[in-house]
Amino acid sequence: MKVIYTTVLLLVNTLAAGGLVAQDADALVKRVRDKLNMVKDYEAEGVLKTNVSFMKVPESSITVYYKNPDKFKIKKKDGISVVPKGGMSVNMNSLFAGNGEYTAVPAGIVNQNGQQLSVVKLLPLSEASDIVVSTLYIDEKNALVRKAITTTRESGTYEIELSYGKFAKWGLPDKVVFLFNTQNYKLPKGLAFDYDTGEKPVYNDNTVPQKGRVEISYKNYRINKGISASVFEG
């Protein structure tokens, strides 16, 4: 494992030429974290859409609860409770959990949708971490993550795309799009469904890898108003 880690570290260091230096990468990631850490908790209303070949889930209204640093829960209005049960996460804060126990490595500059983004790779220092590497595409001017690609041991590689609006100053997106390979399927943390209505997943026997898509569009946030820990129980 140490040999693999060293190889990855050397590789991403070669990508840094012409972009950020390591100290700048650390400072940029700190700015992103500091912005996210302004949010101690929130309750948000939104709409959840899914496009997964083996699961039939209707578009629905949801309430999202978050409490710093890593408590996250989604509740649907139609009786289906969506609770954290491990796996991947649609919550950006989860990438920075662990008190900064990672190495930030600069990996160049890219242009995406006409916007220049700094690329930073986060390598967890703990060999017990499920995350192998996260690649962040950061809007340096506004300290916002526009895209994140994360490779895990348990659930393969997944991608998060984020769009921002009036809550950008808090680092909170108006829209999150979560893309993953259904062959390595494990629902994101906060999106493991309890089928309280009796509806079960519809599975597809096709073994060809397919992309799953989960989209959350936020209507509003109530930020730093206090949320009881009991909300995240059960």
Regions found by a protein language model. Give the residues of each.
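Positively charged n-region of N-terminal signal peptides that target proteins for export
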Residues: 1-5
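Gly/Pro-enriched, hydrophobic low-complexity segments
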Residues: 116-230
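Flexible, processing/modification-adjacent segments and terminal tails
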Residues: 23-38, 48, 56, 65, ...
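Sec/Tat signal peptide C-region and signal peptidase I cleavage site
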Residues: 18-22
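Sequence/structural signature of outer-membrane beta-barrel proteins
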Residues: 51-53, 183
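Bacterial N-terminal signal peptides
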Residues: 7-16
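Extended beta-sheet lipid-handling architectures
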Residues: 43-46, 57-59, 74, 178-180, ...
